[in-house]
């Protein structure tokens, strides 16, 4: 870890630790079943305000956390130091991840849109700024769409609908003397607003070409409409030979033999380029850290692990690496994995907290979640079928696991679902996308499910497998 990064972590931790220590303790919810009434409910120890302070630090103080970058490393060290301060044994598990091509835009506009974008790998990648006025051009797939005024300017386009279309936009702008090209997405792949992307160019270009999110492009378009133009500076960086980290905290039973069953609470802490990732997935990481604090003094006869994975957004790389590092004996020790991803959105159509498995089957974790919902008199907890998160590698290895996510589902076949429109965008921030009430509910449900799992006897089938 570089010295400058370490200084940032230490100074920032002092500030956030003070804020967290002053947060009030949340009120407990009454148990509605008799299964655990003999012991205090873990919800008495849970405070969503603490979790949201972690969300705020990760998404605002650090910001976008693409896999393998310095910002992701900063986040991993922050998480590790928080867990160590609670008394946990902490391991950093490194693994290699693909290169990142990141564009940076200096703009007179507010920084709330996170002026970070995807850079085209085979366009100009340079830390020396390309500075020029910005001009918006409608269309651009035909040469006649491009006015002569683009000469010496940075051109903003609404991204063409296909790779071929946006390559034509770039090539036509270059032929008219453009100094840079910004392509902004209109829509994402899941009904969300357009997100940043790395343009795939068919020809090498000697100017910077960036892929912007809808919010960024629209903000620039509005600025041009108001003022006629604005001056931008473009820089880009190719980050190679990258290492990402899984942060693993363990709490062994008081009488440990090394063969006890284990319950895992997990999340990923990285985000996509250009997105502060408050809900996706600083929310899950804030939940993991708050549950780690709540469970630090809970005695059980099972091991509990709190794991935050790196580089989920680049293909579940962290969780896949972790699962592959386990022997079959170690895999058999895991009773279940409670994976939190996008657990605090305020989006009204994401109306249920789901416990999802990749194939839709029930397992130890979904059963625990549904039981917790009943115990808490919460009828918003449902079970369903969904992949696309860190529960998948565990499930593929035969380990019971479930994804916890706020979502609205209109139909399972065909699958028609709702997640927040600001998913994977610069608008995924605390102010615009985080609900303390939703965070509270996720903490209560997952916390209660984990608590019950740690207290109850190991199922007979699991005892035989051990």
Give residue spans per PLM region.
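Soluble metallo-hydrolase cores and metallopeptidase-like ectodomains found primarily
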Residues: 117-144, 198-278, 293, 297, ...
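Second-shell loop/turn segments in exported
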Residues: 37-47, 60-73, 89, 121-125, ...
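Metal-dependent peptidase/peptidase-like ectodomains
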Residues: 300, 309-408, 412-413
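N-terminal capping segment at the start of a domain
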Residues: 33-71, 86, 93-95, 196, ...
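Sec-dependent signal peptide cleavage junction
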Residues: 20-35
